[in-house]
């Protein structure tokens, strides 16, 4: 069951009006998630352009996650519009498109963590760690990413059959659909168990070594596992427990309908608590749109502070492409007069530097230059 389907009907459980809660949730939390998520996505994208990650393999996976997240975040305002106006904007195509990338975001965020953990676990399983190369890791990761992309695309296309417009409102798949339980199993439970097993195996393997392989970043992997447990676990557990909201209502509530609205009443306060918990846990679950990319960027070594300085400098001054730390080289590259160089349009010949005492230039000889090599050496 997806919590976005809750605001399509007027829902009252005893004295608790769940409709107002869900409307406020969608308008506030989805708006905040959109702005924060897009800002972080843009920031990490610029970080990748300005400074390549230290770990190219994790950087490759992080880029795939950022692309899916960006498309999913762009569609979130459509749900805010539906919550505010009670109708869907964009037609049947945009409804299915939003549902497809919302589903793909669930799988890509969680399974990308599996790929990163698998890469480090596979390296630790090698008998000779010196044989591990970046090229081999990249090829292996590309193969795993290709398989994952096919799986995510297939499930995303399958979600098109579960997403449709009814009464001018977009309905995602709900608990009575097989896809809802598949999401709970393959979208969270199975990948999280795989991550936990591999991390435990890595810890046991490294405890037997005489040195500490810090490149594994085991502490960050454990934080990643803990983040997925806290953010994704409550929502998928409660969603699988409640099932379809329609069947949940039919089992636990008395259905009253009229020509204007459809309302649900029941005196048991526990049902209102379950609806409120479902909304709150879903708000926690969508934090994966920026929590997972931040963790992956940390593993990739983006160095956010360095990138932030480059971004602020970009806004204030022109950035030179060359490294102009040496003042003499700076003048030469800018075409300014330099007393140590004979500058001409075709070539630049190096003149021997004269010492204050009139002696020979021993510094150039120490560097391996003699007069014959200097006469034959030219730049350009």
Swiss-Prot record:
Swiss-Prot/TrEMBL keywords: Disulfide bond, G-protein coupled receptor, Host membrane, Membrane, Receptor, Transducer, Transmembrane, Transmembrane helix
Presence of keyword ATP-binding: no
Region (Disordered): 328-380
Matching Pfam families: 7tm_1
Superkingdom per UniProt: Viruses
Entry's localization field: Host membrane
GO CC terms, sorted: host cell membrane; membrane
Disulfide bond positions: 95-170
GO molecular function, one term: G protein-coupled receptor activity
Family as reported in the entry's similarity comment: Belongs to the G-protein coupled receptor 1 family.
Protein name as it appears in the record: G-protein coupled receptor
